[in-house]
């Protein structure tokens, strides 16, 4: 009976992993076609969340199974074959990509959240965003000293939230290998905030 249950669990895990099998789209005559489809799917929303801001809305990518899969594969292609202990995602859209990447790699996922959203003892770092000021936090036991970490988020703008995340990772003793973003707004020069961390982005505006 126990063996049967274990067999069922293994079968269930196998079926679940199939849903994250490499997308044929991701391996097409390289990603130029894929990237263009992703670029077209990202929707500009003017004056959100404040007047004068053009918000990059990724929900059309998330709602399309092929495009969502392709976007995850972009991150995975940067991570496979490397020694990575944890994937860190930034509240909130970084969770959507980071947790899927961590699952596929078989490593832990660490959420960095806005202050007041985590229940246990935290480290805190402040940041400036193009539309305000805020603080981010991470559980003090989320990353062990010496662990190799990749930061994943949907968008790099001014670099404030990402820089705060990098501070938290390093406070914990983690080694930040790379910061990866689906979208980068190059005119805001956010990657300067992350120096000397290598920055990778797939869709540049």
Q: What name fits each language-model region?
A:
Residues 2-4, 8, 12-205:
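PRPP-associated nucleotide enzymes
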């Amino acid at each position: 009976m126990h063996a049967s249950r274990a067999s069922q669990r293994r079968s269930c895990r196998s079926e679940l992993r199939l849903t994250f099998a490499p997308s044929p789209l991701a391996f097409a005559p390289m990603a130029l076609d894929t990237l263009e489809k992703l670029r077209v799917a990202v929707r500009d929303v003017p004056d959100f969340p404040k007047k004068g801001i053009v918000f990059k809305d990724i929900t059309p990518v998330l709602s399309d199974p092929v495009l969502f899969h392709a976007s995850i594969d972009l991150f995975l292609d940067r991570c496979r074959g490397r020694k990575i202990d944890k994937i860190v995602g930034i509240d909130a859209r970084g969770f959507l990509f980071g947790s899927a990447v961590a699952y596929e790699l078989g490593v832990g996922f660490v959420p960095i959240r806005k202050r007041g959203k985590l229940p246990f003892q935290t480290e805190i770092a402040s940041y400036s965003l193009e539309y305000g000021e805020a603080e981010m936090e991470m559980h003090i036991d989320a990353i062990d000293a010496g662990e190799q970490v990749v930061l994943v988020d949907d968008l790099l703008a001014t670099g404030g939230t990402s820089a705060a995340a990098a501070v938290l990772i390093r406070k914990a003793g983690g080694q930040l290998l790379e910061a990866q973003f689906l979208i980068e707004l190059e005119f805001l020069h956010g990657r300067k905030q992350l120096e000397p961390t290598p920055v990778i982005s797939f869709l540049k505006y």
